[in-house]
């Protein structure tokens, strides 16, 4: 242990203990979403199963509610809904990660947890920090108990990446496949084109670039947080592209891969994962039941809206409810809350007729089977309006007090809406349409106490969570 890590190990728990009471007093503190003890949270990292528990790491700024230097926060759960915070796993305490232990992934093998992450280094000087002045290193931390580190090392630096790239190469996702190990890295070229590098290894340490995944025409200048996975025999690439034309500052979605991603392949058209205000940098993993589970950051970088109500209590952001990924008949990715959420539903369901306003705790689960136009209103200031004629769904804040700058988001459904599910927590709404084919995620900030819910155009069932 070096001196910096020794001191950070003392300082972070102190900061957390000093801010814990204030954060806990926030009425907008979430009940079943992973959130930081204090400070800032963004990307999910290192999602895995280890020792009979789910492990989730997260980009964590304990010293700054608006970001700051990034650590890897750490939490465990047995049901994906109730999380126990553990001590920070990765500190920015080495020359190769001194400006932040940035995003990455976990590989669990033979009782050992391998954490691959981006070591961020910003060199002093008059640099643009895009084409020069920054180091994005692929680093490896190893743990034999899932809690403490046995080693950290730098595996790759910018000199090891292919020619023609900027300094921005990051977010390693590592997995085993057909007797070898593979890594995908998000990258930005010198021509400002986003792409994903595919690397191969036989020993988890030495890596060789074997392919690059991209589109024929530029699609954004940077592809962040790549995730490469197979469902029902079809391979998918999920990325968070920056610089595309979309409703949010940055996009988030998936391509279907046609061909062998290790050699020669093409990408399908891009499909948005979430049409809401707050969804970015999702990652997925396979659990012990063979389910592919995806978790996203319920936030958005560089957005012109915020979370001032929680910032006032010394914390900001959370993860989404974990979602099981499946495929539809046409290969479309479907997202639905993990079934563990069903066990949290109250035994007594409330049945509301069309147009009937009900009041209940903000932690609720609503289901409905609409057959035409409908309008859902939550807390008398958040509306979801569906128009059957053009299969368009609009999420709109009509009360600025709930929004902290959020306004309107829209999505066109591929088919008429015949199922609606809304999962509410103390300061979030996650909306699943047509069995998870279209999803909206947003934070919102209702007054303390019960919230009103009214669905016009269909009857609905509501349960407390």
Each predicted region: which residue ranges?
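Repeated scaffold domains used in trafficking and secretory/extracellular systems
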Residues: 221-226, 279-282
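Beta-rich accessory regions
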Residues: 15-20, 256-465
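Beta-rich carbohydrate-recognition and catalytic domains
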Residues: 1-171, 176-219, 230-275, 298-347, ...
